[in-house]
Regions:
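S-adenosyl-L-methionine-dependent nucleic acid methyltransferase catalytic domains
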Residues: 1-154
Length: 154
């Protein structure tokens, strides 16, 4: 009998799962599974989901691709995090940009910082995404909903 190893037997992104679990634990009353039972209800949903997916997903000869697929399924990849992003203020993007870019893309009056109306929405979105991509995983999580809070197959 040939035993094909599961993803969880070859690798498991413990650090990322731990960070997501911590974010879910901080939600206290907003946790999804607490009312479902004594044992499973105490485990963060992202941890339960990642273990089940890690057990069901076979490992291939390409560990990097396996990890990409695993993170994509759990919306923990770059695009998934962006999809989960609740919103970044114009002020945060403004502070991150160079002085030249600030003048080009923003209007400042007193303490009010707003996007310049002459910029296409796609350009504002591109700069916001660029700022988001420059953040560490921990910093990105501050702007993100939990995976189960977004629409779609999460």
């Amino acid at each position: 009998m040939v035993h094909n190893k599961a993803f969880i037997e070859e690798q498991f992104p413990v650090s990322l799962i731990s960070k997501e679990s911590y974010k879910e634990r901080k939600a206290v009353a907003g946790q999804t599974l607490t009312g479902l039972g004594k044992w499973w209800g105490r485990k963060p949903l992202i941890l339960v989901r990642s273990v089940i997916i890690g057990l069901l997903m076979p490992a291939s000869d390409n560990p990097k691709k396996d990890r990409e697929i695993f993170l994509k399924i759990l919306t923990m990849d770059a695009d998934g995090l962006w999809q989960r992003c609740k919103g970044i203020t114009a002020k945060e993007v403004y502070e991150w940009l160079s002085e030249t870019e600030r003048e080009k893309y923003f209007n400042v009056s007193g303490k009010s910082i707003r996007w310049n109306n002459q910029n296409p929405k796609q350009e504002c979105d591109r700069l916001t995404r660029k700022y988001f991509d420059s953040l560490s995983y921990d910093e990105k999580l501050e702007y993100c909903d939990r995976p189960e809070q977004i629409a779609g197959a999460s």
